[in-house]
A protein has these predicted regions:
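Periplasmic-binding protein-like
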Residues: 136, 151-152, 212-222, 260-283
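Early extracytoplasmic/lumenal segment of secretory-pathway proteins
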Residues: 47-115
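A bilobed periplasmic-binding-protein/Venus flytrap-type ligand-binding module shared by bacterial periplasmic
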Residues: 155-162, 197-202, 275-290, 307-310
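N-terminal secretory signal peptides
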Residues: 1-21, 25, 32
Length: 369
């Protein structure tokens, strides 16, 4: 199952292959995500303490060094930062910690994993005497066992050629009479069941805990009119080809569809599911407290977060970033105040406590079990 972070890398490479950006811009944008490959440094750097960041895909260490490592190392000359692009899934983090062979210091993860792994005692708590809580817009982005330098959303995308008066809510998404045609959902319960619950009329401020039985039954109602995606590129393709007339996609893919189709494919922020791009530190990480200093630097870099929004669409989480966002990008920013106001902040704690069981039930249902 492809993660959001992996899809960000793939999306950048697609734009590069289409000639929509040059190599320098590609490297700069990937650096905003902290994406790169670990490489040997100069002999003089060997005496420095190394911080290893694990991400979901990588190209070159030089780009990461230029945009994240160099500013951090300039302020902290005793450290160097390298990348490991080995995909830090919850399972891999758990295996590392339980085996006592931890090689990662900071991992691009999720709120669900932060609560799940943190509850198992496998993560270091964030040291908020080092990491400034005021550098994020709210508690969703600053958790006990992780903090978020970016955000993303699950949103409703539709074909306006088929539906000039398009759907305005998840209730409309489930209304096959008014909006006939095949729907598209992710082959994963997170986001999907949140939307199913909203389609039943549950207010956003009382969405959690989810009524799992009711949400699963709601998906089952339209099962014969559903197709499922496992990667961002696949979700985009389902919509482009018309195999699905509407779907739930990551907002970054929704942006590509809307801009490249000149508005034929549209998306709405209403009832979007806003999620933090959480970074976590495995218990027993080699660099120890230094990982907290790097995390603090990432959250403080509002200008870099805005550049990431411009490049990929990932939303900034630093409150200072809002005033820096160019007007033409506000439409696509999940944390733009007007956009965030009509979304629901996904409850990572609930998902962390329930994901394994609920997702297994969901997969069993959608695969015909």
């Amino acid at each position: 199952m492809q993660s959001f972070q992996q899809d960000c890398v793939e999306l950048a490479l697609e734009k590069f292959r289409r000639g929509e950006m040059d190599r320098r811009t590609l490297l700069a944008g990937l650096a905003m995500l902290g994406v790169g490959a670990g490489a040997a440094q100069q002999a003089a750097a060997q005496a420095q303490q190394t911080i290893v960041m694990a991400n979901w895909g990588g190209l070159v260490n030089q780009a990461f060094t230029r945009y994240y490592a160099e500013p951090f190392m300039a302020a902290n000359p005793g450290f160097r930062v390298v990348q490991d692009s080995a995909s830090p899934s919850a399972g891999r983090i758990r295996s590392m910690v339980e085996s006592g062979r931890v090689t990662w210091d900071l991992c691009d993860s999720s709120a669900t994993s932060a609560f799940m792994l943190g509850g198992m005692g496998l993560l270091n708590p964030v040291d908020y005497s080092v990491v400034n809580r005021e550098n994020v817009t709210g508690p969703t982005f600053a958790l006990e066992h992780g903090a978020a330098p970016y955000s993303y959303s699950n949103v409703l995308v539709y074909d306006s050629r088929r539906f000039p008066e398009g759907p305005r809510s998840w209730a409309d998404f489930w209304d096959l009479r008014r909006f006939p045609g095949t729907r598209l959902l992710r082959r994963d319960a997170t986001g999907t069941l949140d939307a199913a619950q909203m389609s039943l009329g549950t207010p956003l401020d009382s969405l959690y805990p989810l009524d799992v039985r009711a949400a699963l039954a709601r998906v089952r109602e339209i099962r014969r009119n559903l197709v499922f995606w496992t990667s961002g590129a696949e979700s985009e393709q389902f919509i482009r080809t018309g195999e699905a007339v509407m779907g739930q996609l990551w907002h970054t893919r929704a942006k590509v569809l809307e801009t490249e189709s000149n508005g034929r494919f549209k998306f709405i922020w209403n009832q979007g599911i806003l999620q933090p791009g959480i970074f976590v530190s495995p218990r027993g990480n080699p660099a120890g407290p230094a990982a907290q200093r790097l995390l603090a630097s990432m959250l403080a870099g509002a200008e870099y977060q805005v550049r990431l929004l411009q490049f990929f669409g990932n939303g900034p989480t630093n409150p200072r970033a809002a005033a820096m966002v160019p007007a033409e990008f506000r439409r696509f920013n999940p944390t733009e105040p007007a956009n965030a106001a009509v979304q629901v902040a996904q409850n990572g704690r609930w998902w962390g406590e329930n994901y394994a069981r609920v997702n297994a039930e969901y997969i069993d249902m959608v695969t015909g079990g």
